[in-house]
Amino acid sequence: LAPGTRTLYLRTVRCLLLEKFGDRPVDVAAMTPDDVRYFFASQSELYSTPGGVGSVVSALRGYFRFRTACGDQVHALLGVVSYPANWQLASLPKALDSAEVKRLVDSLGWEGPSARRTDAMVRCALDLGVRCGESATLSLDDIDWRAGTIILRKTKSRREDILPLPQTTGRAIADYLKLERPQTTSRAVFVRCTAPCDQPIGPDCVRKAVRQAYARAGLPYTRAHLLRHTMASRLLAGGSSLKEVADVLRHRSLNTTLIYAKLDSRNLAAVALPWPGCVA
């Protein structure tokens, strides 16, 4: 499991045990199916998507499987919660339209203590589809300025990917490194702007910076991942194939990229059947 997933699962299990036992010693044999159901119901209200609720199920089932392997009699708890229906490709991926992209880009270059760092992180997401965790772990050694490439090492798929570095993205990163980045021995590209400056930023810092960029542009969005969808949509609109989009997004399977076919208006129009107006 990825570090972020492990942290999420640990937090869920910790909440379950605290709700049931408080400060008392944990006796998993004393936990009943109703305890798990009530906890699951309360946790489900915190998530707005089936995927979020599914993460609670995965955390609980993983913990009960672990306790079973340890010899605890918790077989009755394994089947208490089930995954919600989550139909793949059921919805359109949300993305910024061209006017919203222009508003976001025009809002960059603002004056502030971390302005250039924010600009560089937004450009990484918008131009390369870099995830928040990947931005946070980006190293100075990952950028080949002469070749115009960038290496993403700590990716979701746990492999190294080499991507071309667009001029606008490279310029934004270079401006941050030359004009704003604190003097530090850290090899991380993006570091804290306040003490301790030797520490790299975390994914939450990237998410917060993108949310603030949305707000400055007057856009009603909060999710940083929206910029990754936007990049895929722009590639399709520019004539790129799904295979090319999959390569840039670094998807292992082309099936993962198929959802973006719904945004390919150019090719969809070519295969659309005439509307039977006489029937309507």
Residue ranges and their predicted role:
Residues 1-280:
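Conserved catalytic core of the tyrosine transesterase superfamily
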